[in-house]
Amino acid sequence: MILPIYVYGQPVLRQVAEDITVDYPNLKELIENMFETMDHADGVGLAAPQIGLPIRVVVINLDVLSEDYPEYKDFRKAYINAHIDVVEGEEVSMEEGCLSLPGIHESVKRGSKIHVRYMDENFVEHNEVVEGFLARVMQHEFDHLDGKMFIDHISPLRKQMIKGKLNTMLKGKARSSYKMKQVK
């Protein structure tokens, strides 16, 4: 089922999400709905707060990029109770967008290497060192779990330049090709 994506201004996007337990109701269905919602909106990642749930669940699908990044062929994963323990390596700038900020794309600096811990869909714990583009996507999505958005990483000048677009979202007048839940 395709769910509405919560847009900038929705309070849940600024909450710190909670860990969940193995008995969280309908988790498999939730994860499938998140993948379907993300795919429908042409995203590569989606965090539960973006569909209104303040829980630490993220889905990432990089298979759509496999022409440019062959290493991501068939890459489709769910991350439960995800945390980044260390960010290191060279800081790299790259343009980012976000399904919760339709129409906004800005250059964001992020570390090129991270140490992450999470559980998979079967609640098996993983500790990994991740580099490159996946590290960027994970940092972006895991930020949502801590109540942050990529615009929190841009300069005050750049933020001032997108203020009009942000105000449009705060008025509930954002436009996109996918179903959204806007501020009323």
UniProtKB/Swiss-Prot annotation:
Keywords: Hydrolase, Iron, Metal-binding, Protein biosynthesis. The active site is at residue 141. The keyword NADP does not apply. It comes from the Bacteria. One of its GO terms (molecular function) is peptide deformylase activity. GO terms for biological process: co-translational protein modification; translation. Binds 1 Fe(2+) ion. Its cofactor is Fe(2+). InterPro entries: Peptide_deformylase, Peptide_deformylase_sf. The keyword Amino-acid biosynthesis does not apply. It catalyses: N-terminal N-formyl-L-methionyl-[peptide] + H2O = N-terminal L-methionyl-[peptide] + formate. Belongs to the polypeptide deformylase family. NCBIfam families: pept_deformyl (TIGR00079), PRK00150.1-3 (NF001159). Removes the formyl group from the N-terminal Met of newly synthesized proteins. Requires at least a dipeptide for an efficient rate of reaction. N-terminal L-methionine is a prerequisite for activity but the enzyme has broad specificity at other positions. This is Peptide deformylase. It comes from Bacteroides fragilis (strain ATCC 25285 / DSM 2151 / CCUG 4856 / JCM 11019 / LMG 10263 / NCTC 9343 / Onslow / VPI 2553 / EN-2).
